[in-house]
Amino acid sequence: MIDIIFHDKTGVTPYNPGQTGGFENAAGSGEIHYYRLFDGVGIMLLRLEMETYTEIRTQIGMIEINFCINGRFETSFSMRDSVLLKPGDMAVSCYDGRHGARSESRFPLGCYEGLCLEVDPAAAQNWLEKNAPGFSVDFAVLKQNLLGNRWFMFGTAGPRCEHVFRELYENAPYMDLRFLRLKVVELLMLLSRIPQEEGTDLYCSTEQTELAHHLRDHLLTNREGYVSLAQLAEEHGISVSHLQKMFKQVYGVP
């Protein structure tokens, strides 16, 4: 059972976070703590022990930023579009009403710790302009910097953003609202301005990820004797180094 705990000291209009819906009927255990920081912005701390879940998106224009603390987080939006996060990576999406309405997620290691930042750009910008005009964020610029003409991206968060993500994750349970608001605004400003590194999205393809799962299952169920990496690589027409790279990306070990 996944326990979903809401923490809201803002006193603003009640809000239903987007990502928690997929966990209500998921098989597994763990906790999701949702912290409402200000109108249009909330963060979720996820500590899960499970294999899979299905997420349904309905809120058009919502920006969702996931950061991996520990474990692996794999999401497939279609037969071709797949995301695989390892610690220090982030994934950004903005549901446009067409792409990513449904996604299938897996946790290859059976456990996951992460942070999800959900932003309603219009509500957040309105709140910032009224309450923190000196720290306003241009969400159109943020989306252009992160996504360009795409609806999702993924890759390394980079040292500056990773530091702030981890500060949020570690300090959210203390519920110091002023500190958490400051950190979220800092993160949004960084994401608006830091150029995305070349090589973003250059991770294992969906086919490679599925192959890694297949090979792992083969190794676990093979009862006929020892099979070397060289044999597996040859059988599937890839090099040993490429096979090791796939396992490293998906499971954290070569």
Residue ranges and their predicted role:
Residues 76, 83-208, 229-230, 234-240, ...:
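Alpha-helical bundle regulatory/interaction domains
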Residues 242-243, 247:
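Short hydrophobic/aromatic patch on the recognition helix
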Residues 57, 204-208, 221:
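Residue-level marker of regulatory loop/turn positions in helix-turn-helix DNA-binding domains and
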Residues 1-19:
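Short Lys/Arg-enriched alpha/beta "domain-start" segment
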Residues 41, 60, 64, 175, ...:
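Short, well-structured alpha-helical interface segments that form or flank functional binding sites
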Residues 212-233, 249-254:
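Terminal helix-turn-helix DNA-binding modules in bacterial transcription factors
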Residues 14-113:
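N-terminal functional module of multi-domain proteins
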